[in-house]
Structure formats: structure tokens, C-alpha cells
Amino acid sequence: MFARTPRLLLRPGFPEDAPALACAIGDEAIVRNLSVVPWPYTVRDAEAFLASPRDPVLPSFLIFERTDGPPRLVGACGLGRRPSGAVELGYWIARASWGRGFATEAGRALIDIARTLGLPQLEASHFVDNPASARVLDKLGFEFTGLVAPRMNCARGEEAPARLMRLRLAARAPLEEAIAA
């Protein structure tokens, strides 16, 4: 599965993406805001991530900025199943691309995919000390559930408090919405 937005190409990662992936995410300021990413992050970690099995339905994408030349890797995003069975939206953006709206743009594409898949809702979380991610989730329409729970963070070497967010998606099927429009 692939997705395009006005500025981005979202596509699965391939083995040849490992060096660029390791370079883009190899920043403690990024990894300290992700729960399961190892630190320090190496090319070997990128190779293992890219070779790991993926959910056959829920997408996992690398995010590329569309340019006049070859697309430039700026992050990753995806939908994943939590142990509770809920579907979680996750993302990260390389530091050089912070503040350009890429997380919001990629998140909107994932929400469209979730609606197409007929998912009733999405969950997301952000560490309490990451207000930038809170702003992205707010822009995407997620609402705070009132729950703050500890989540493990490999870069921090400990659990840190994370706010649980939820987005309820349209109850109608995508085809019904298109017909009604």
C-alpha cells in the first residue's frame, strides 16, 4: 500500500532504505519521544525494523518529501494493533523537517486509510513532555481520554507518563459517505 499527499509520499520501507532511515531517526531528541525504538539507533536496527513482519492490513510507512529530484526521507508513520486490540496511530519526523506540518499531513492520510478500512476509532499517545506531538494530535482531531499511563521508553531507559488520545471515526462506511456527498 502507498499513499500520496500534496507534499509527501508514504510507502513501505525497503532494505535499501536502512542507511537513510538510521540517519533520519538517529537523534536522541526523536527517539526519546518514541516508546519502543532502541537508542542509540544503528543501521543494523534499521535493517531489522525493515525486515520485521508487518500486519497484512494495517500500513506501516516511511514518509518521503516529494521533491524535484529523488524523494527525501523525513520520517515514518503507521497504524498498529495494541495488545488491547485497539488500533494506534504513530509517527515520527526527522529533526531537519520539524515544524513543516509533515506529521499532520501524514496523519491525515493515515486517518483516511483507517476510514477506508472501516475502523471505528484510532488511539494515539504522546509523552507528557512532548507538546509538539500533542499539537499534532489535536490538529488531527484526537481528544484526550483523561488517562495518563506510564509507557516504556528505551532512550530514557525508564517509563515516562503518556497521555492517551482517541479519535472516533465516522460510523458510516466510506462508500455510504461518498454517495451522501
Stretches with model-predicted labels:
Residues 45-47, 53, 136, 159:
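A generic membrane alpha-helix/interface feature
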Residues 50-62:
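A short helix-loop-beta-strand connector motif used in the catalytic cores of GNAT acetyltransferases and
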Residues 35, 58, 116-119:
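Residue-level recognition of short, structured coil/turn motifs
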